[in-house]
């Protein structure tokens, strides 16, 4: 148990990223992520200015893309799942 229920469902024209999860674990699609400019490592992306909102069966990440990096950016690896704090 604890595996992902479903991979992320995203919309290219929306600011909402819906993440289906199970056992408090989820993964993020790279559709709304931008590659890290400060690293040359492949597979690392950054989600800027985000906030988590919990709903019945999914999480919604609301974000505002900006140029450069802010204090509340989150770097992840493609396909990586992690715990919700």
Curated annotation (Swiss-Prot):
Q: Which GO terms describe its cellular component?
A: cytosol; nucleus
Q: What does the record list as GO biological process?
A: meiotic cell cycle
The answer to whether the entry has keyword Cytoplasm is: yes
Principal subcellular localization: cytoplasm
**Subcellular location per the Swiss-Prot or TrEMBL entry:** Cytoplasm; Nucleus
Per the entry, what this protein does is: Has a role in meiosis.
Protein name, as recorded: Meiotically up-regulated gene 144 protein
Source organism per entry reads Schizosaccharomyces pombe (strain 972 / ATCC 24843)
**Lineage, highest ranks first:** Eukaryota, Fungi, Dikarya, Ascomycota, Taphrinomycotina
